[in-house]
């Protein structure tokens, strides 16, 4: 049943999976996240639609700025051009009842900030192969955007400028997706006016802190920060004041991840150091080069992306079960007929047959071959085929915390992620 409750005092009724609220061509099914710039809602289309959306609605106070509205729409349209398996797809930018919104694919999962927080709470780390794979896919998505061209083949020179854990989504199907790519440039020009940049300094590059011209290499540095933090479960840059934090970023004095995690190899230390080089000339010159080195390292681990799916479902076991239940209510579908990859335009809801017994893999089975990013010489980057979730999930293996012989060299820092991100789940 669809609720007819109107919005009051500029606020939207968030709705619920079993109590949808109309919003233009969509029905809102509950609030996903709220920030200083926008609110994000789970939504579906008209009755009978078999697809979920994430609808980002601009806060009313920002809509008073005409130039911001214009940029919001222009950058949203740019995001619609970013069709890559490692970037959340944007379907449309629109307006309804004086509210401006962006409709994106819905990804059932958690952002990387939440993953790091849960790892800290459970005294474990993201396994090294998983962290390497996630960083490689982040770099792949960045490279695709960096090399996007217009219809005449002219480079668009896109730079994200806001690559951070909160903008990386990990799905329960093991997908890695960059969020908010197309509107990053618009938001960064206005967020300082409403205090949103506070806390973002720790994911900026040295040249960004200095106010210098930026290119793709600034996103490489930010991706390096994320890699370092996944390997160590520690914030790389922090300070008691904003000025102190900015000085830390400007100097870019980076300890090797192996100082915190003995499972990090010298080769991985070297990759992190090159991505985090203070001077851009010493850094990876493209996100593709970073992705290539990370993918080469993954081959040595014989990592299967399905392991990330298992890790996410185990780490967020209760949340995953709730996701299945809410999705069934949202789409008026039986829970057993659902997969988490429900937002793909070509397929819609994936109906899963009865589970089959798991098939054991031979011990020497090689890892799945990973597509490389589009080359910079192509006029228009082409997205590699997306990773699809298998109908019958493999048995979840219990993730083990780091071995006791790997002591934390800085125990006083262990509570950082939990204390920083104490938010409502």
PLM features per residue range, with description:
Residues 39:
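Conserved N-lobe ATP-binding subsite of Hanks-type protein kinase domains
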Residues 44-52:
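Conserved N-lobe loop of protein kinases adjacent to the ATP-binding glycine-rich P-loop
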Residues 57-81:
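AlphaC helix of the eukaryotic protein kinase fold
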Residues 93:
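Activation-segment/catalytic-loop signature of the eukaryotic protein kinase fold
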Residues 97-111, 115:
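Conserved short submotifs of the Hanks-type protein kinase catalytic core
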Residues 140-158:
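Protein kinase catalytic-loop region centered on the HRD/HxD motif
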Residues 166-169, 202-352, 422:
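C-terminal lobe helix-coil module of Hanks-type protein kinase domains
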């Amino acid at each position: 049943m669809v609720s007819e409750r109107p919005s009051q005092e500029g606020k939207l009724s968030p709705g619920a999976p079993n109590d949808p609220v109309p919003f233009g061509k969509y029905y809102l099914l509950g609030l996903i996240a709220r920030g200083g710039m926008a609110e994000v809602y789970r939504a579906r289309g008209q009755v009978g639609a078999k697809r979920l959306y994430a609808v980002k609605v601009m806060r009313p106070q920002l809509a008073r700025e005409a130039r911001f509205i214009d940029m919001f729409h222009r950058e949203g349209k740019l995001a619609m051009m970013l069709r890559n398996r490692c970037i959340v797809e944007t379907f449309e930018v629109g307006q309804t009842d004086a509210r401006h919104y962006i409709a994106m694919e819905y990804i059932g999962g958690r952002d990387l900030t939440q993953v790091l927080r849960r790892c800290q709470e459970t005294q474990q780390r993201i396994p090294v192969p998983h962290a390497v794979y996630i960083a490689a896919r982040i770099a792949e998505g960045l490279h695709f955007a960096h090399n996007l061209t217009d219809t005449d083949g002219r480079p668009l020179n896109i730079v994200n400028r806001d690559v951070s854990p909160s903008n990386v989504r990990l799905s329960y199907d093991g997908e890695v997706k960059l969020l908010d790519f197309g509107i990053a440039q618009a938001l960064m020009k206005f967020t300082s006016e409403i205090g949103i940049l506070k806390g973002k300094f720790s994911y900026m590059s040295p040249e960004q802190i200095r106010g210098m011209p930026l290119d793709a290499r600034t996103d490489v540095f930010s991706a390096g920060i994320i890699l370092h933090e996944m390997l160590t479960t520690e914030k790389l840059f922090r300070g008691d004041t904003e000025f102190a934090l900015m000085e830390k970023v400007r100097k870019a004095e980076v300890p090797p991840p192996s100082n915190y995690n003995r499972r990090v190899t010298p080769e991985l230390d070297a990759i992190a150091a090159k991505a985090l080089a203070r001077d851009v000339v010493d850094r990876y010159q493209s996100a593709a080069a970073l992705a290539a080195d990370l993918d080469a390292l993954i081959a040595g681990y014989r990592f299967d992306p399905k392991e990330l799916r298992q890790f996410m479902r185990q780490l967020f076991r209760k949340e995953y079960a709730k996701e299945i239940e809410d999705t069934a209510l949202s789409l008026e579908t039986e829970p057993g007929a659902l997969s988490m990859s429900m937002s793909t335009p070509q397929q819609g809801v994936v109906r899963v047959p009865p589970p089959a017994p798991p098939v054991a893999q031979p011990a020497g089975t090689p890892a799945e071959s990973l597509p490389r990013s589009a080359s910079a010489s192509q006029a228009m980057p082409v997205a590699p085929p997306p990773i699809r979730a298998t109908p019958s999930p493999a048995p979840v293996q219990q993730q083990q915390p780091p071995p006791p012989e790997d002591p934390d060299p800085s125990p006083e820092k262990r509570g950082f992620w939990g204390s920083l991100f104490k938010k409502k789940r």
